[in-house]
């Protein structure tokens, strides 16, 4: 997919001015140049052009709010003066895996006064003697080179990202967590109500069982009384019969 079409798809019916992040990794650039990216992206803070076949950044539009630029795995060998001209507020630049051979090719980056982090992994320039010392001397505004400061202390994760973009993502994550907490609270309330309903139903069932047992007990007592009465009547009948038989014998 070419770069122009990819940009159109990434817009998703938004205006360029509404876009803060734009990822165009692995798309195709014609003639090794940036295409379809215009100065209308005035609020863009993060731009990623990894492995798009770039040879030059000469077509880069002016992006006054851009803080982080990913240009790794391309074929850029020079012409970095355009970065200072077009990206005055750039703080993070990744040029890893490009065709940069000499320290002198990095000299235009001196004009990027806000530049805080620079990555040059897998560039030939990193094989030079005193590479790190030379780059830090050339670019005194740098805090981190290839993820480490002048004292070889590793950069914390927060310094490897754009602050503004990270804050927005953290806010969104916080809102998602709050929503999940609210849902969990509602589920707990529903569970408690269900437990109460079950307890009430259980009490009602116990009452019904008790009433049935009482009724059953009364029925048994009534049956016992009826049997006793029948036995008494039967005994009286036998007694009368004996008396009658005795009178007949006397006659």
Swiss-Prot record:
Sites bearing Phosphoserine, chain numbering: 158
GO molecular function annotation: histone binding; RNA polymerase binding
Tissue distribution of the protein: Expressed in heart, lung, pancreas, prostate and in spleen, thymus and placenta.
Biased amino acid composition, Basic and acidic residues: 234-244
GO CC, alphabetical: cytoplasm; extracellular exosome; nucleoplasm; nucleus
Reported function: Multifunctional protein that is involved in the regulation of many processes including cell proliferation, apoptosis, cell cycle progression or transcription. Regulates the proliferation of neuronal stem cells, differentiation of leukemic cells and progression from G1 to S phase of the cell cycle. As negative regulator of caspase-3-dependent apoptosis, may act as an antagonist of ANP32A in regulating tissue homeostasis. Exhibits histone chaperone properties, able to recruit histones to certain promoters, thus regulating the transcription of specific genes. (Microbial infection) Plays an essential role in influenza A and B viral genome replication. Also plays a role in foamy virus mRNA export from the nucleus to the cytoplasm.
Assembly behavior: Interacts with histones H3 and H4. Interacts with KLF5; this interaction induces promoter region-specific histone incorporation and inhibition of histone acetylation by ANP32B.
Protein name in UniProt: Acidic leucine-rich nuclear phosphoprotein 32 family member B
Primary gene name: ANP32B
């Amino acid at each position: 997919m070419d770069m122009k079409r990819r940009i159109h798809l990434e817009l998703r019916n938004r205006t360029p001015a509404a876009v803060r992040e734009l990822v165009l990794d692995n798309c195709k650039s014609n003639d090794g140049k940036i295409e379809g990216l215009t100065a209308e992206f005035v609020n863009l803070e993060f731009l990623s052009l990894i492995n798009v076949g770039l040879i030059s950044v000469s077509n880069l539009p002016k992006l006054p709010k851009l803080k982080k630029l990913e240009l790794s795995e391309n074929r850029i060998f020079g012409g970095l003066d355009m970065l200072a001209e077009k990206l005055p507020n750039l703080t993070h630049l990744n040029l890893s895996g490009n065709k940069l051979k000499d320290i002198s090719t990095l000299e235009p980056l001196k004009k990027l006064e806000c530049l805080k982090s620079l990555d040059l992994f897998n560039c030939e320039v990193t094989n030079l003697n005193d590479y790190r010392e030379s780059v830090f001397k050339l670019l005194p505004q740098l805090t981190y080179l290839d993820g480490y400061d002048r004292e070889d202390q590793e950069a914390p994760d927060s310094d490897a990202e754009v602050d503004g973009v990270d804050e927005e993502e953290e806010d969104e994550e916080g809102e998602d967590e709050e929503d999940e907490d609210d849902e969990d609270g509602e589920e707990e309330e529903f569970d408690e109500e269900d437990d109460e309903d079950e307890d009430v139903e259980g009490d009602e069932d116990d009452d019904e069982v008790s009433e049935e047992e009482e009724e059953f007990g009364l029925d048994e007592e009534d049956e016992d009384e009826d049997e006793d009465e029948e036995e008494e009547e039967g005994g009286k009948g036998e007694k009368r019969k004996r008396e009658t038989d005795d009178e007949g014998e006397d006659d």
